[in-house]
Structure formats: structure tokens, C-alpha cells
Amino acid sequence: MPHVSTSSHKRPRKLWWLLGFIFFALFAVLQMPAAWLLEKYAPDTPYVQHVSGNLWQGSAIWQFPVSATPLTGAAEWSWQPWHLLLGKLGAEVDISSEQTRLNGQVKVGSSSWQIQNMSGKIAPETLASVVDWQLPNTPIQVNNVSLKRQSAKNSEASSSDRNAAGFREASGQLTWVGGEVGYPSGGKVFYLTMPALRAELSAEQKNNKNLLHVNLINNQDKRLGDLYIDGDNMLDVSLTQRLLENMPEYKGQAPQDTPVVSVRQPLLSGLGAR
């Protein structure tokens, strides 16, 4: 009669105890109050005014100090545990501010963040809080936008690591019906009648840098301009003759697809941030 050692019975039992302890510890961590974690790890953050719930599910009141009156809103999240298999924290997120509503998935890794399937609308009131322009009362529609941004590992990263930082993946569209835009510059307001346009997002590599490319086109798929954002949050703007022909004070002449304005500025400054 075969003899079965008692140690062979103990090993599976120990394994189950270990797995049980791991799941219990994970459950305990997920039930930790989000307010306590914020107080412990980011006590002086200016961006979060109130937080409730826990890591699994909760909500927060946020503000972004872009002007004398900060942009405020709310965010709700629901944790998606299967992203841990990829070494990331992932959650379903709803973001709102006045009439702005966005829904999508947010994933955060040790040196990257990712947005997937973000859709909704950005209200004109929200845009007016961010940029010092006169804008038409029409929202920007966000259609299935996905972004993946890689960060340099640390401030002393090599030049190759810094070049690797930036946008590795991008897709989706922004659409806008357009209208009259007033752009202040040099104490004067310049008016431009924006046509209905579509902004198509993609990731491109230029000069060994990973860039987010925003291709601006009209309803006839004609080119209006290009925006590029790099890993250092620098914005490159290129506008074509076709777009500037909608500005009454513009008298330049060139083939319509020719870029006639090119500007490079920090991201928020380039958007006319308050």
C-alpha cells in the first residue's frame, strides 16, 4: 500500500492559506478611504477639494487653477482590477464640469498613463475658463479618443530616454461646428470665422521624438492646419492659407494648402491660456 507523507497534504493547504491572505490584503487595501490616502500621500495638492469613497469606487471634487476663477468639476471612478495583470492601475472614469461630460478608461503605470475610449463633449463654458478667447456657444464633441503617453523615468534621464518620452499611441476625433472666434493679441482682438472642422488624432515620430499629431480638416477633408505636442509639453501650431482666408484682416496670398503661420510655444501658452 503506497505511503503518502503528511507534508504532501500540508503544501496545498499552505498554498490556499497564502492565496487567501493575498486576496484579503488586496480587499483591505481597496477598502481604504480615498480621503485618508489623499491626506497621507498628497496633503498639499491644489487640485482636489474633496474626495469620498475608497480605492474601489469613489468620487472627487477637483479644481484646475487656470485663471482667476479656477475651473472646477467632479470625477467619479470605478476600479477595474484586471489591469493589475498588466502592471497598471485602471479605472472607469466619469468627468464633469458645468455642461462638460466625458467618460472613458484611465490607466496609470510606473512611467506612463493611458486614456482609452474617451467620449463626450467639452462645453464652451469650460473652454472659456481655460483660454482667453471669444468663443461661439458650441461644444466640442469628443469621439472615442485614446492616448498613451510615456514619461522619462526621472529628471536625470539620458537623452535617449527623454526622446522616448511622449505619445506612443493616439486615435480618435474631436469635432466642432465652428463659429466666430476672437483672438486677443497685442491689445487688439482678431476675428476668425472658423468653419466646421474635424481634428483627427494620431501618434507620429519626428526627429526621434514621439509626438501627438492633431490634423485639422474641414467637412470636405481639406487641410486647415496641424498641431503637434511633444514629450516636453511643447505645442507646434501650423495653419494653412485655407484657414486664414476666413480672417477678414488677412490679406496674404498662397496656395490653400500652404502653411502660412507656424508657432512653437509651451502647451497652455500656445492655447492662449489665461
Where are these regions (language model features)?
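Alpha-helical transmembrane signal-anchor/signal-peptide segments
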Residues: 33-53
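Non-cytosolic head/periplasmic domains of membrane-anchored proteins
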Residues: 102-198
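Hydrophobic membrane-insertion alpha-helices, especially the h-region
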Residues: 10-33
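N-terminal Lys/Arg-rich, disordered targeting/topogenic segments
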Residues: 1-12
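Extracytoplasmic/luminal low-complexity segments enriched in Pro/Gly and acidic/polar residues
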Residues: 213-274
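Beta-propeller and related beta-repeat scaffolds in trafficking/envelope systems
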Residues: 75-84, 167, 171-211, 249-273
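N-terminal beta-strand/beta-hairpin edge segment
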Residues: 46-133, 138-145
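Short, hydrophobic/proline-enriched secondary-structure or compact coil segments at domain edges
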Residues: 89-93, 112-120, 172-175, 212-216, ...
